[in-house]
């Protein structure tokens, strides 16, 4: 099994193999997940002080905050898994 890494902005990288979900931070349940992760010490803030636009949830219950759009992270995730997608325009 090869390790795949995804750039989530500002030089920060997460392991694609460990990502469970990439979601928007707007809903109340996601805000609760962020708050709970902060209380447990499992929140990673990779926004560099900018507005949180994507919340990445991992299989280890860590929650990563990113300043780039969830669609952008998801696109990087798909392109990483299937390089042929990089050649096609959506």
From Swiss-Prot:
Please list the coiled coil stretches: none
Which Pfam families does the protein's record reference?
RemA-like
The record ties this protein, via HAMAP family, to: RemA
**What family does this belong to?**
Belongs to the RemA family.
Protein name, UniProt field: Putative regulatory protein SYNPCC7002_A1845
User: Which organism's genome codes for this protein?
Assistant: Picosynechococcus sp. (strain ATCC 27264 / PCC 7002 / PR-6) (Agmenellum quadruplicatum)
């Amino acid at each position: 099994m090869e390790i795949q890494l995804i750039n989530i902005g500002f030089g920060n990288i997460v392991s694609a193999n460990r990502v469970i979900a990439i979601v928007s931070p707007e809903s109340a349940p996601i805000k609760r997940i962020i708050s709970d992760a902060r209380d447990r010490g499992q929140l990673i803030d990779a926004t560099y002080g900018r507005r949180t636009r994507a919340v990445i949830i991992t299989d280890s219950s860590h929650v990563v905050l990113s300043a780039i759009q969830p669609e952008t992270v998801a696109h990087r995730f798909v392109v990483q898994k299937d390089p042929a997608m990089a050649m096609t325009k959506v």
